[in-house]
C-alpha cells in the first residue's frame, strides 16, 4: 500500500504541474536582448506597448552591441533578442522582422554637403566617425568600403551614437548611423544627409534566439508585436 500511495502522490503532483504550466507560460517573465541602435530607438516603444497590454509580466532588458548580445543568446541568458546585421552562429535561429537604412551625415557646412553625389572614395577622404569594432553598424560600414577596395581608418570610434552625432554636428567629420537615430537632427537641420546611391546602406533587422530555447506564449506574443511594428 505504501508504494501505491507514493505512486498516487506522484500522479497528483504531475497533474498539478500540468495544470500550473499554462498559467506560468502565459505570465512568464521576459529576458530580452537588443543591440544599441534598436535598444535606443525601437525597443522602448515596443516594451511600453506590451506592458500596457500585459502589466502582470515582468520584462528584463539587456542592451549591448550585437556581438555581445549574440553571445548572451548562445549562453542561454536571453529568451530572444533584436539585432541588426547577419548572425551566423550555428546555435542561433534568426528571422528578419524589418529593415532600416544607414545614413551618411555631416554638418550643413561640410564640403561634401553641396555635392549632388558622394562616392565612397569621397567619404573615405574625410574624417570618419564610426561605431566601435564588434558592432553590427561598424561591420556593415567596413564591408561596404571593402567592397569598393577601400581601407578605412576612423577618426572617432565610439559605443555612444550620441557622441558621434554631436561630433558630426560640430563639423568633426562624417558619421554613418541608422536613419532612426539621426532623424530628429536631420529634421532640425543640425545634420544633412550626404547623397549616396539609393539603398546602398539598407540592412535587415533580426529576431534571434537559441535554437533549443523554448519560447513562452508571452515571448511569442512580444515577437509578434515586433513583426507588426511600423516605424
What are the functions of these language-model segments?
Residues 27-90, 158:
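Central regulatory/effector-binding core of bacterial HTH transcription factors
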Residues 65-70, 74-78, 83-84, 139-193:
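Hydrophobic hinge/microswitch elements
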Residues 42, 192-231:
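A late-sequence structural motif
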Amino acid at each position: 500500500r505504501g508504494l501505491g500511495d507514493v505512486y498516487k502522490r506522484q500522479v497528483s503532483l504531475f497533474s498539478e504541474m500540468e495544470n500550473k504550466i499554462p498559467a506560468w507560460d502565459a505570465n512568464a517573465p521576459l529576458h530580452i536582448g537588443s543591440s544599441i541602435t534598436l535598444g535606443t530607438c525601437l525597443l522602448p516603444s515596443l516594451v511600453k506597448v506590451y506592458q500596457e497590454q500585459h502589466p502582470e509580466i515582468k520584462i528584463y532588458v539587456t542592451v549591448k552591441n550585437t556581438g555581445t548580445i549574440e553571445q548572451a543568446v548562445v549562453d542561454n541568458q536571453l529568451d530572444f533578442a533584436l539585432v541588426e546585421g547577419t548572425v551566423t552562429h550555428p546555435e542561433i535561429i534568426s528571422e528578419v522582422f524589418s529593415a532600416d537604412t544607414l545614413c551618411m551625415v555631416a554638418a550643413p557646412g561640410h564640403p561634401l554637403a553641396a555635392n549632388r553625389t558622394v562616392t565612397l572614395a569621397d567619404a573615405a577622404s574625410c574624417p570618419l566617425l564610426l561605431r566601435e569594432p564588434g558592432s553590427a553598424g561598424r561591420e556593415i560600414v567596413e564591408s561596404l568600403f571593402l567592397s569598393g577596395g577601400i581601407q578605412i581608418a576612423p577618426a572617432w570610434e565610439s559605443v555612444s551614437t550620441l557622441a558621434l552625432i554631436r561630433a558630426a554636428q560640430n563639423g568633426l567629420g562624417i558619421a554613418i548611423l541608422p536613419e532612426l537615430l539621426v532623424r530628429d537632427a536631420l529634421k532640425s537641420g543640425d545634420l544633412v544627409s550626404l547623397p549616396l546611391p539609393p539603398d546602398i546602406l539598407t540592412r535587415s533587422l533580426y529576431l534571434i534566439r537559441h535554437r533549443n530555447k523554448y519560447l513562452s506564449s508571452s515571448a511569442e506574443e512580444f515577437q509578434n508585436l515586433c513583426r507588426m511594428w511600423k516605424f
